[in-house]
């Protein structure tokens, strides 16, 4: 199936005039933007199609559709078309936003008058190739452009603005083929096949149609039956989104949770998070301590928070000595486990305190005794308590020797010199000693304790 355009239609200037009028109406439609630099409307001066456009039908569906509807896919090719438009723009940008701007923000200039610039734009050598979907229903034709390949030459009367306007026009051409041309072709087909009165009565204009859509969208209200069709999961997500909008409020709407958004902490719930942290301050802040009575109370004491960010014991606890070492150790362990939960190899740095015992008179007396040549540790051991008297024998000759009798049944151990059994490392490496129940009182004799190979000397 093929179609052929009537050359007489394109040769007659009436077709170009109709296209020019429709294009002027489409370009002068009310803009959605508040700010507009156009001082006057857009005037289409000339439209020319020197060559007949080519139309190739790629697909046509008539059988499956109703009789009043025809659907097809076509390829449109147009060459050497020309378009010339003219308008006036406002170069003083301060006047554009003067109505919507407060007077105290506007600068006081000496001359703030209007400065208009007429501009003429010419599009020549227009080449267009597009794949379109055509819908023919009753006397109207609807066309939607899918794949568009457009090329043209642009000339502007203001040369300094030519490159900027050309770049912006090429970026906004999708709006022309999406909105302007389909509405222009549809209105032209209505006026072509039907009378003007019937077309206006049956089909509203673009502005009325847009107003109808906006009014209908504002009056849309969900009925009770519509909520039954909604998914409960979607309703739950919507309710969570609505509740999460209270992040900037001064008072939290959810009392038992730290945040309405998972993973986020709100500012008004920061004190709850800090109060739940294990620390010495938070643990002892709940206890009541006696406060000093004073006639004047400062404002800082009235608004003093009940939590602190540092991990220290309060001064009142130290003064009253109401702390427990086991509780402090437990809190510090919880803090370490919380901070090193991801690191299993981390070891706590514990502070070790060595408690040294005070020196007793017996220890001071043992330090004054003569040291043995061997490096084995020797300390003083008292076999009986101090209160129990030790039986002593009479002095024997020579007078500088003294014998001591031990309470032990098996061995006789001297009172002042004995083996330190706690030093296991030294006794394991050295040979064992054999002690005799004699004690030298004068260091001038130079007697030595004997080993197993050489027994001690006797006189």
From Swiss-Prot:
Protein keywords:
Lipid transport, Lipid-binding, Membrane, Mitochondrion, Mitochondrion outer membrane, Transmembrane, Transmembrane beta strand, Transport, Ubl conjugation
Q: Where is the composition biased (Basic residues)?
A: 348-359
* Record's keyword annotation contains Membrane: yes
Q: Which residues cross the membrane?
A: none
Modification after translation is described as:
Ubiquitinated by a SCF (SKP1-CUL1-F-box protein) E3 ubiquitin-protein ligase complex containing the F-box protein MDM30. Ubiquitination is important for mitochondrial integrity.
> What cellular-component terms does GO give this entry?
ERMES complex
Q: Which residues lie within the region annotated Disordered?
A: 338-375
Q: Does the keyword Mitochondrion apply?
A: yes
InterPro entries hit by this protein: Mdm34, SMP_LBD
Tell me where in this chain the SMP-LTD domain is found: 1-190
Q: Which cysteine-cysteine pairs are annotated as disulfide bonds in the entry?
A: none
One of the entry's Gene Ontology molecular-function terms is:
lipid binding
Q: Spell out the Basic and acidic residues composition-biased ranges.
A: 338-347
Q: Looking at the record's lineage, which domain of life comes first?
A: Eukaryota
Subunit annotation: Component of the ER-mitochondria encounter structure (ERMES) or MDM complex, composed of MMM1, MDM10, MDM12 and MDM34.
Q: What is stated about domains? A: Lacks alpha-helical transmembrane segments, suggesting that it resides in the membrane via beta-sheet conformations similar to those predicted for other outer membrane proteins and porin. The SMP-LTD domain is a barrel-like domain that can bind various types of glycerophospholipids in its interior and mediate their transfer between two adjacent bilayers.
Q: What does this protein do?
A: Component of the ERMES/MDM complex, which serves as a molecular tether to connect the endoplasmic reticulum (ER) and mitochondria. Components of this complex are involved in the control of mitochondrial shape and protein biogenesis, and function in nonvesicular lipid trafficking between the ER and mitochondria. MDM34 is required for the interaction of the ER-resident membrane protein MMM1 and the outer mitochondrial membrane-resident beta-barrel protein MDM10.
Protein family per UniProt: Belongs to the MDM34 family.
List the protein's name: Mitochondrial distribution and morphology protein 34
Q: What is the lineage of its organism?
A: Eukaryota, Fungi, Dikarya, Ascomycota, Saccharomycotina
What is the gene name?
MDM34
């Amino acid at each position: 199936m093929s179609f052929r355009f009537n050359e007489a239609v394109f040769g007659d200037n009436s077709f170009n005039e109709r296209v020019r009028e429709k294009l002027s109406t489409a370009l002068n439609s009310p803009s959605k933007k508040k700010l507009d630099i156009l001082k006057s409307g857009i005037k289409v001066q000339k439209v020319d199609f020197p060559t007949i456009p080519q139309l190739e039908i790629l697909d046509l569906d008539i059988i499956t559709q109703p009789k009043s509807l025809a659907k097809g896919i076509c390829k449109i090719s147009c060459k050497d078309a020309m378009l010339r438009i003219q308008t006036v723009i406002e170069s003083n940008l301060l006047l554009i936003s003067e109505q919507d701007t407060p007077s105290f923000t506007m600068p006081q200039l000496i001359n703030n008058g209007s400065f208009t610039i007429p501009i003429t734009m010419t599009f020549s050598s227009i080449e267009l190739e597009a794949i379109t979907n055509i819908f023919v229903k009753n006397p109207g034709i609807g066309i939607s452009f899918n794949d568009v390949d457009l090329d043209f030459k642009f000339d502007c009367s203001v040369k300094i603005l030519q490159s900027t306007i050309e770049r912006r026009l090429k970026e906004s051409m999708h709006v022309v083929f999406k909105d302007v041309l389909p509405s222009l072709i549809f209105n032209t087909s209505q006026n072509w096949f039907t009378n003007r009165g019937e077309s206006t009565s049956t089909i509203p204009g673009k502005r009325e149609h847009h107003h109808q859509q906006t009014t209908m969208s504002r009056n849309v209200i969900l009925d009770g039956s519509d909520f039954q069709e909604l998914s409960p999961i979607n309703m739950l997500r919507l309710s969570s989104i609505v509740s999460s909008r209270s992040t900037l409020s001064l008072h939290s709407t959810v009392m038992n949770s730290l945040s309405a958004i998972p993973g986020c902490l709100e500012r008004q719930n920061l004190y709850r998070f800090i109060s739940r942290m294990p620390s010495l301050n938070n643990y002892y802040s709940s206890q009541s301590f006696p406060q000093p009575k004073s006639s004047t109370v400062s404002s800082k004491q009235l608004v003093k928070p009940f939590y602190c960010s540092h991990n220290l014991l309060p001064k009142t606890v130290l003064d009253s000595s109401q702390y427990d070492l086991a509780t402090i150790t437990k809190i510090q362990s919880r803090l370490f486990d919380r901070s090193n939960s991801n690191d299993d190899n981390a070891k706590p740095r514990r502070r070790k305190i060595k408690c040294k015992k005070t020196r007793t008179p017996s220890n001071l007396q043992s330090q004054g005794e003569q040291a043995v040549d061997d490096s084995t540790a020797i300390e003083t051991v008292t076999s009986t308590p101090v209160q129990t008297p030790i039986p002593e024998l009479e002095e024997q000759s020579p007078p500088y020797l003294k014998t001591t009798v031990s309470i032990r049944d098996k061995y006789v151990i001297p009172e002042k010199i004995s083996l330190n059994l706690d030093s296991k490392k030294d006794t394991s490496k050295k040979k064992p000693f054999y002690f005799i129940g004699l004690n030298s009182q004068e260091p001038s004799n130079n007697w030595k304790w004997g080993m197993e190979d050489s027994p001690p000397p006797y006189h």
